[in-house]
């Protein structure tokens, strides 16, 4: 996930072949520490995913267009929420599309004012999911999403949510990434999941995602490479896991450990901040944010 997330207006992913799933999600600086504390808290309380209640997440879709660029019809938005619910079935989470809106804004469509876009459009509290579909992310970048934090400030509340290349929705033009699973992948970051491969440059020497039941994996997958095994430790690479970079058609699972991780972090980070929203906090001075890291 160590990819630049600075938007550029110079390239649009319209009917192009994407070589690899480009993800720009980067955990905020304190996330690793907060994650370790959350894991300690969960162990102390004997938490397991079987004790967590089912959660319905209010979801808002924002379609950003520049004229005809980025248009997504209602049927496609419905298919996207159906993909999300199918992929998260069995996790304890479901998604209710409570609102969708379209905004024609050339600057937002080209990624020139991420903060301005979100501060104007974001809805709901910290337990709501906002997804912004934009047509012109930097070439090779299909999306990014913000990791949760225990005590979000107003800027973090505003910037929360996922930005998705509009060509990746079901039936879109991002070849091999046109079944809506970029949104599934990025929402995994919203829930607190790392990539299954090692983002820290540690090769096979580190467990990159800190989940016990995902085998150590040194690099992302591309395509659907059956039997790929990038590390000598037990287990082959998780090519079918939603948090890898495989083609959409190859992805079909979260591990039990990932499900428990999502349940744990939801309970400690998002459910506890359900009443917090940007509108309920003191105003801050807007500024251009080229990097969404908090």
UniProtKB/Swiss-Prot annotation:
Predominant localisation class: secreted
EC number(s) stated in the UniProt entry for this protein: 3.4.24.-
Glycosylation sites: 49, 54, 74
Keyword Ribonucleoprotein: no
Keywords (A to Z) from UniProt: Disulfide bond, Glycoprotein, Hydrolase, Metal-binding, Metalloprotease, Protease, Secreted, Signal, Virulence, Zinc
GO molecular function, one term: metal ion binding
Signal sequence extent: 1-19
Gene Ontology CC terms: extracellular region
Matches recorded under InterPro entries: MetalloPept_cat_dom_sf, Peptidase_M43
PROSITE patterns: ZINC_PROTEASE
Binding site for Zn(2+): 185, 189
Annotated active site: 186
Keyword Ligase in annotation: no
Localisation per UniProt entry: Secreted
Pfam families: Peptidase_M43
GO biological process: proteolysis
Record function comment: Secreted metalloproteinase that allows assimilation of proteinaceous substrates. Plays a pivotal role as a pathogenicity determinant during infections and contributes to the ability of the pathogen to persist within the mammalian host.
UniProt family annotation: Belongs to the peptidase M43B family.
Protein name from the UniProt record: Extracellular metalloprotease ARB_07495
């Amino acid at each position: 996930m160590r990819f630049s997330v600075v938007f550029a207006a110079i390239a649009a992913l319209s009917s192009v072949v994407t070589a690899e799933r480009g993800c720009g999600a980067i955990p905020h600086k304190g996330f690793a520490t907060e994650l370790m504390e959350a894991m300690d808290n969960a162990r102390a309380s004997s938490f397991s995913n079987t004790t967590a209640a089912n959660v319905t997440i209010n979801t808002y879709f924002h379609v950003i267009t520049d004229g005809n660029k980025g248009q997504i019809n209602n049927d496609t938005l419905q298919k996207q929420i159906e993909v999300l619910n199918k992929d998260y079935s069995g996790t304890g989470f479901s998604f209710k599309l409570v609102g969708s809106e379209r905004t024609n804004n050339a600057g937002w469509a080209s990624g020139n004012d991420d903060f301005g876009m979100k501060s104007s459009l974001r809805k709901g509290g910290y337990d709501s999911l906002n997804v912004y579909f934009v047509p012109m992310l930097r070439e090779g970048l299909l999306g990014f999403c913000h990791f949760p934090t225990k005590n979000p400030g107003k800027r973090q509340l505003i910037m929360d949510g996922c930005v998705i290349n509009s060509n990746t929705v079901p039936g879109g033009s991002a070849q091999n990434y046109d079944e809506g699973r970029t949104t599934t992948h990025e929402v995994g970051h919203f829930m607190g999941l790392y990539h299954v491969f090692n983002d820290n440059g540690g090769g096979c020497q580190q467990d990159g995602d800190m989940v016990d039941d995902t085998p150590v994996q040194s690099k992302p997958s591309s395509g659907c490479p059956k039997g790929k095994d990038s590390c000598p430790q037990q287990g082959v690479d998780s090519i079918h896991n939603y948090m890898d970079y495989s083609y959409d058609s190859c992805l079909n699972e979260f591990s039990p450990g990932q499900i428990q991780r999502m349940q744990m972090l939801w309970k400690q980070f998002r459910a506890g901040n359900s009443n917090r929203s940007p509108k309920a906090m003191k105003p801050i001075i807007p500024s251009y944010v080229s990097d969404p890291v908090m």
